């Protein structure tokens, strides 16, 4: 049990280790192992030579720090060990090997049993590690020659061996047994004279003489200091080799420089070409990578636009996305836009006057699918360059100019790329708009609303009464809002309150850009609501007011004094026709409102209300009339801006209009009532006759 523990601890391994080490070798001290483990900069070899019994082994032990042993035990083989030594002014780790050299070794065979007989041949046959076997001066840095000052033959050995030492190796002649100086035979002066008269070539290394005593460690310090000479020589040789290597490196570098001077690397023109090629190589991936994030950012922008379509009317989402697409690539487009939006409204007004409202309403939806295909083709073919990159900035913009909206509404196939994309994302919008168009198409639509719409019709038809009674207070409220609007709209807004039907319309198209398009750019919602509410005469008036050209004509007529009432009614119908929502559910009392409108349109009660309205306008709207003349000179851009602001303020006008309608109901006019009664009797019979008369009236105008 205890033996096993000892084996684990390793206490019994030390003696075994000594047994395994061959003769003449020993294990290195642990301290030296740790020191040399860090790295050795210099390896220095010191050789101790001398005749027998001169104290070589004693010196070898003393250098290791061991005690002096008085008994003489002849050394059989060369012994080598490492000692602690370092140069005083350097931190370099120096490994000093000390060799105890035996000139003639004797190898004794150690047997396990008793020696039975002498065998001299066997002893001679075995080889020993001695000076005869190997060259002890090879790679030697210093030599220590020892002799006994009490024995002359030991000094003769020194005289024989000194010539064999290489000339570059320093030698220290050490006279041992100084403790027995009373028996000395060799004097120090004799030794110095011999060393001085040795025949050595010039440049040979140094010879030094000293005396020592291994018994009391005398002369060891001197010997330690003597080791500085072989170390410094070794360091010098090392540095010289480094200097040679350094010089060789310098020469090689000079050759490389001379060769490189002739290569293409030193040609400036070639260098510039390489730089240009690198710049082009770096620029091409940057452009592709710059486009990829834009296309990636496009995906999140489209869904929010579809969400906004749900909140607004079906036609509103399309123009919101279109203007930004046109603005960045083609800035001159806005200048060319004004003539384009004017043409579609004229065609729609004429068509509606002649009773072709369903056709006009149905016409716009079909061309929209074709742009969708074009947009999809564009996106598929050009994947890297997406023109929709501008949507990122446009989606965050607050408003869209009314001019752009009109222009975009007029150019369905050209600029409807983004619109088609948004509808492709939200197909419910297109379906809902188709339903509205289908409801607008049937011409017999005014017949069912005759019963339900009277509430709306009464409020809308009594605009003339509102001009007299409630026109003044409303004008004070609405005038500041409509200041930048065109002349015709400003006079109408001051004289007349906005219709109540505009309230639902303004609620949805609250975004300013879409609302502007709802009023002027898109005629579909206007026609749909007018058809649902009553006869086509109201539609005709609404579209007449929508057309900016017609407004200018009505202004000229208003100067004559014949058609101020008609213009006011057209303004009021225009406001009524604005809503984008699908047709409201039928309500009773529709014929009363439409009869009043028809009477105004067809001239049954036209003269008296016209005079009263003109007188009221003279009282209330004199300054606006002058402003109208001045503002007529301004371009259509101002009208578009006014239309845009009109959409913003519709809520306030709707509220004021509700009050005006109540007052109109309370105090109707006698002369108008008679004419309106006749119109009710006439229009109650059939709606188709209304549009014909309305068309004739429009031609007379």
UniProtKB/Swiss-Prot annotation:
Cellular-component GO terms for this entry: cytosol; nucleus
Low complexity bias locations: 284-315, 495-506
Key word Zinc present: no
SMART domains with a match to the protein in the record: RAB
Chief place where the protein resides: nucleus
Family annotation (PROSITE patterns): RAB
Location of region: Small GTPase-like: 39-279
Alphabetical list of Gene3D superfamilies matching this protein: P-loop containing nucleotide triphosphate hydrolases
Subcellular location field: Nucleus; Cytoplasm
Biased composition regions of type Gly residues, renumbered to the chain: 683-701
Family: Belongs to the small GTPase superfamily. Rab family.
Free-text function comment from the UniProt entry: May enhance cellular proliferation. May reduce growth inhibitory activity of CDKN2A.
Name of the protein described by the UniProt record: Rab-like protein 6
